[in-house]
Amino acid sequence: MKKDDKQTKDLEKWQGKLSSAKSAYSGTLDKMRKREAMYYGSHEIQGAKKDATNVRNIIYELIESQVDSTYPLPKVTAIHREDEDKARKLESLLRNQARRMHFTELNDRSERTVPVQGADFFHVEWNPAAGYHCTLGDVEIELRHPRQVIPQPGVYKLDDMDYVFVQISKSKEALEARYGIKLDTDTEDAPDARGGDDGSTHTGVVTQNIVYYKHDKGTVGMFSWVGSQVLEDYPDYYARTAEVCTKCGRRRVGDVCVCGNKKFKEQPVQTLTLTQDVMLSSGEVLPAQVQGEDVPIINPDGSVQLDNDTGEVILMPGEMQANEIPAYKPHGFPLIERVNIAASDMFLGVSDVDIVADQQQAINKYGTKIQEKLLKGGSWVILPEGVQAELNDDELKILRVENPSQRSMIDVINVQPNVQNDQNMLEYNYNWAKSTLGITDAFQGKYDSSATSGSAKQFSANQSAGRLQSKREMKNNAYAKLYRKMFEFLLAYADEPYPMTDTDVDGEQQYGHFDRVEFLKRDAAGELYWNDEFIIEVDPASNLASNRERLWDMAKVDFQAGAFGPIGDLNSARTYWTWNKSTGYPYAATVLEDINKQLEAQQQMTQGVNAVDLEGNQTGDLTENVQF
């Protein structure tokens, strides 16, 4: 079967599966639109003929109250003792990557999407056009809205799926430039993947459909298309590709293969060719060239030479060949799901909007009712028959009466509706919603009459935070998986040493490189393998470390309590300011330098006094010897 025919059949296959998957997912997609509308303050009242005229958006308020602008930093632990230095270097690399890719912005968007929709996804890719000047390619992370990720019907866990779809709205010109083809379509197949309630399409924007699928004992493949045109088809998505001879399968090293064939094809390869000698962390050197297998000596007539005594074929050393090492491949789909509240029977987690939707609807009704009552209330004026009042905005109005009796008949009746019960029900629903999500006034920074002291208020806030611990654990779990996937991509594709920087325990800036060859090891059987045996999680204390002002205040209290040593001692001050320097305290390096100078001068003075004492003792001993 020709490649074009196979791609056509694959295209029809995946188009059909996408249609079925999206149909099964349509109910969830409809809910997503309603959730976003409520988050942005929808005026719709379910079951009512008219919309709300006054909306107190508690959904927006309660979700924004939970936003955590910090993201957890990686923590890498070595499983083997000899890998401790590699673990520290890997941890520094992942921290560098998080800063380079501006995880703060990524996290900020995720903090809204996850509680509203129940989940979102990190999409990990390798961009060969990215990287520093001395590197080729780099890891890229994109945040995918749950409406862009279409799951396999009937399967709720991403790792258990046979396939999963990703729909991305992209510029037509950008896709044409990237893949070098002319796209036939000029409109979006799925405008809902881009977002927006109107569902309108835009000229020059198309929908790229991507499917990641598993086959052949877990091998991950990728198929991508726009309209009816195939963009990418990789049965082994993570495998490296190389040009090989169509006849003998050897790697291409020139225009003509050693077998004489001139035709080559691109195909996945499971090994990498060394271009230079490399040294493993064990000290073993892998040469770029190795001796080939012994070959028989051929006589001029084409026969092989035999040993006259034994009759065995005489062999000579083979030609030098390029050395090959195994290629590393990441595991699983390149998608990481971050869940709000885990549920066993749902692909996405539980949405906060769904939980408090009834309370929001009730508040919409009561808010509208209160406003209508107040607006319809007012004052009624009683006038005698025939008396006319001036109806204008003048401050002084004239009312003409014929006699005093008409004046006595003039009166005003104030009609003020009672909205107390409506206000009470509105507040009840607001408090019910807060209680359901585990949010208290202290957690929001509001006045809390139940907390009579600062410690009590902090305790109340901590209790509320404890109820939200599950969400934080889901966030930490997602970031830990993301850091693991980033490490796998760098281990697979970062061919050049990757520059990185970090601050050591003394607060000094250190510079170095991440070289993936350091993770290449040889096992007991003599086989080479890539060492990815590290526990990658997140550091719970990293959020505190990012809040430097609080950290400095805590250290100052410890210093005053003598935790760094006796107060007034220069060595204690040096320890304290060394710690401050490591956390980026302003001008800590200048203070530390001055303390070191004082210690050095103090030490020199002490040495001088000791030298004088020693000289005096020697003179005294000499005098005693002479007298004796």
Residue ranges and their predicted role:
Residues 77-84, 91, 95, 135, ...:
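Terminal, low-complexity, charged helical segments
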Residues 210-211, 221:
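Non-catalytic, regulatory and substrate/membrane-recognition segments associated with hydrolase enzymes
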Residues 1-43, 114, 122, 127-135, ...:
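C-terminal anchoring/interaction modules
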Residues 1-127:
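N-terminal-proximal low-complexity accessory segments that begin disordered
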Residues 33, 46-55, 70, 328, ...:
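Terpene synthase/cyclase
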Residues 209, 243, 354-357:
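Mature extracytoplasmic enzyme cores
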Residues 69, 73-97, 160-192:
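Acidic/polar, low-complexity linker and loop regions
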Residues 257-259, 326-333:
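Hydrophobic/aromatic interaction determinants used to assemble and anchor large protein complexes
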